[in-house]
UniProtKB/Swiss-Prot annotation:
Active site: H465
Gene for this chain: betA
Name assigned to this protein: Oxygen-dependent choline dehydrogenase
BP terms from Gene Ontology: glycine betaine biosynthetic process from choline
SUPFAM superfamilies in alphabetical order: FAD-linked reductases, C-terminal domain (SSF54373), FAD/NAD(P)-binding domain (SSF51905)
Length: 549
């Protein structure tokens, strides 16, 4: 088996790469995917989003090592093991990231990845329904929509933000990237619009694209050049030959793992594992970043939440309606209102993210209380805490060692305490007077810094946005793994293109910027001139220097 380009992983970036690298018909593309098909309602029905993440069939099911600042809990760290990768098991929330995020990338050594550079790629990939004219793409493969916004609790949340003095935005992915507004979703015609649906399946209709379902064990490197990929398929070991390049798009956990198994990574660690060092790159597996969040939950005094739909019978009714018409409650992820806020004056960009949900549920999808309720997922998005991905053993089937070092900076605790108190302020606004019941979580008795910290240690969870473990940077940066053209430094014909190359985590969810990374990397791989830089300047809050709102 051979192809011009061999892509490891069919996730958000990998699917986009397969689509763009094969677009002109001149190059053969082979995609290696360890998972399987995405067929069936568990993935395709938006309201069923909790199911695929809980199924070993679709999820690698990783856990962190015990986190010392979180009562030594092992934090769940899901990654998609299916075509579409994590875009097939995520919450379908679409966030590009803030302009300052990408300007920061360039400052950190990723030349050519500033906001002006990446905005044209976001436009190229989008098919926006209702986004801000001039700022959004309208004919790309990735459909992006807003929900129906019919539940009164959604409107109450946005109105509460206004009453508290915060900005509102008609399109947080457009010019005004701060405030309360409608959440955007990767949903189209009532179905999850994953990277597989948007990019991979159309690409596979071309004669020059093929997918192999197998487990990539290592990259074959000969005389400093990547020449293929060793895979395990059906109990047999095979080698897929790359005539031009190998591109790794296997996730922020598995991309560094695969590089290390192939001899690319921190030299001492590789020697400890008995792996021959092909390129000593200490940055491989370092710089692990993520977002954390907690659920703030409140009883609703009116029966307007989704609580009535939680019993199995009514879930079945919603599922049947979706199967018949692709409509009803099953056609939404129920994340239809959100906010991006600054925690303090003087900040250039929002650092707090809110997802609002018109029901109070636990992480396992069960009701948090035997009553109607509502909640927000809230978190600080710009933590300075950094972790690592290392090998557990030289066995390719062994899970990687994930150490996030969550909450290792004093600022993290300060910001999350602020999240608790700010949410109480928001839920205390007049907009919620008709709905506000008792506080379920954290609970009204949790007031002091010490009480809030104890709550956070037990209830903070990952928002499932890992990145940064194969950092993109300047060639003379000893911790950079890839250069700004996504080429692995020290090995020819090898690239990495997924969220692992982010120099710094972006605000919000990472599916959007991961797809953009695949889009832009494809142009670098093909030697194309990058899309023309944008001269559009996003809105800047005129009160930013003196106010948080």
């Amino acid at each position: 088996m051979q192809a011009d380009f061999v892509i490891i992983g069919s996730g958000s970036a990998g699917s986009a790469l397969a689509y763009r690298l094969s677009e002109d018909g001149k190059n053969s593309v082979l995609v290696i995917e360890a998972g399987g098909s995405d067929f069936g309602p568990f993935i395709q029905m938006p309201a069923a989003l909790a199911w695929p993440m809980s199924m070993k069939r679709y999820n690698w099911g990783y856990l962190s090592e015990p986190e010392p600042n979180l009562n030594n809990r092992r934090i769940t760290a899901p990654r998609g093991k299916v075509i579409g990768g994590s875009s097939s098991i995520n919450g379908m929330v679409y966030v590009r990231g803030h302009a300052e995020d990408f300007n920061r990338w360039e400052e950190l050594g990723a030349g050519g990845w500033a906001y002006a550079d990446v905005l044209p790629y976001f436009k190229r990939m989008e098919h926006s329904h209702g986004g801000e004219e001039g700022w959004r793409g309208t004919d790309g493969p990735l459909h992006v929509q807003r929900g129906g916004f019919t539940n009164p609790l959604f409107r109450a949340f946005v109105e509460a933000g206004k009453q508290a003095g915060f900005e509102t935005t008609e399109d947080y992915n457009g010019s005004k990237q701060e405030g309360f507004g409608l959440m955007e979703q990767t949903i189209f015609s009532g179905r999850r619009w994953s990277a597989a649906n948007a990019y991979l399946k159309p690409a596979l209709k071309r004669k020059n694209v093929e997918i192999i379902y197998g487990f990539a064990q290592r990259i074959v490197i000969e005389d400093g050049r990547a020449t293929g990929v060793e895979i395990e398929r059906g109990g047999k070991i095979e080698v897929v030959k790359a005539n031009r390049e190998v591109i790794v798009s296997a996730s922020s956990f598995n991309s560094p793992k695969l590089l290390m198994l192939s001899g690319i990574g921190p030299g001492e660690h590789l020697k400890e594992m008995g792996i021959e060092v092909k390129a000593d790159r200490p940055g491989v597996g370092a710089n692990l970043q993520d977002h954390m969040e907690f659920y703030f939950q409140q009883v609703s005094t009116k029966p307007v939440s989704l609580y009535s739909w939680l019993p199995w019978f009514w879930q079945g009714v919603a599922g049947a309606q979706w199967l018949l018409s692709k409509g009803g409650l099953g056609a939404s992820n129920q994340f239809e209102a959100c906010a991006f806020l600054r925690s303090a004056p003087g900040l250039k960009q929002p650092d707090i993210q809110y997802h609002f949900l018109p029901v109070a549920i636990s992480y396992d999808g069960k009701a948090a209380a035997k009553s109607h309720g509502f909640q927000v997922h809230v978190g600080y998005n710009l933590s300075k805490s950094r972790g690592s991905v290392t090998l557990r053993s030289p066995d390719p089937k062994a899970d990687p060692v994930l150490r996030f070092n969550y909450m290792s900076h004093a600022e993290d605790w300060e910001k999350f305490r602020h999240c608790v108190r700010l949410t109480r302020e928001l839920f205390g606004q007049a907009a919620f007077d008709d709905y506000r019941g008792a506080e379920i979580q954290p609970g009204e008795s949790v007031q002091s810094d010490e009480e809030i910290d104890a709550f956070l240690r037990e209830h903070l969870e990952s928002a499932y946005h890992p990145c940064g473990t194969c950092k993109m940077g300047a060639k003379d940066d000893p911790m950079a793994v890839v250069d700004p053209q996504t080429r692995v430094i020290g090995v020819e014909a090898l690239r990495v293109a997924d969220s692992s190359i982010f120099p710094h985590v972006t605000y919000g969810n990472l599916n959007g910027p991961s797809i953009m990374t695949g889009e832009k990397a494809a142009d670098h791989i093909l030697g194309k001139q990058p899309l023309a830089r944008s001269n559009q300047e996003p809105w800047v809050n005129p009160r930013a220097a003196v106010s948080d709102r």
